Amino acid sequence: MTEHDTVLLAEDDENDVLLFQTAFKKVGVPKLLVCVPDGEDAIEYLKGAGIYSNRMEYPLPCLLITDLKMVKRTGFDLLEWVQTQTQFNGLPAIVLSSSLEESDKRRASELGAQAYWVKPAHFEDLVELVCLLKEKWLTPPQPADLSSIQNRLP
């Protein structure tokens, strides 16, 4: 696996992790989903520290998805830490939270989150969200088909 093949999910609810893994499989996301239980573990993963020191086994992610309300360190703590690390300037961060609070959405945006989505109540809606993730952040752009243009060139 390479960093282009990995998505890091920071989520403390085991049921939500299982639903997310199932949605990833259903949508056919061609990425490894690595799940950690809180913001502290996510930071350790990104640092390559402790049990995450083997980058062959724990490659850097191409996308970070985080819940906000977690034990130890929150999603806000994680976003704030990522924002201070220049090596992660290009890492897209998505918040998937049960919070409907505008202040949470605003703070997540201020801390660099590219999107803030409320956790859906139904699995089908989660599958739809994963489809959006795949489209926007997990599928490389396809090269333009230049054959029609090349055929018209002298």
Regions found by a protein language model. Name each.
Residues 5-15, 20-25, 33, 64-65:
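Conserved acidic segment of CheY-like receiver
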Residues 18, 22, 77, 100-115, ...:
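Alpha4 helix (beta4-alpha4-beta5 surface) of REC/receiver domains from two-component response regulators
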Residues 38, 59, 74-77:
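Acidic catalytic/metal-coordinating carboxylates
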Residues 51, 76-89:
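Short amphipathic alpha-helix used as the core "switch/output" element in two-component signaling
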Residues 67-68, 97:
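Active-site residues of response regulator receiver
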Residues 71-72, 101:
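The feature encodes the CheY-like receiver
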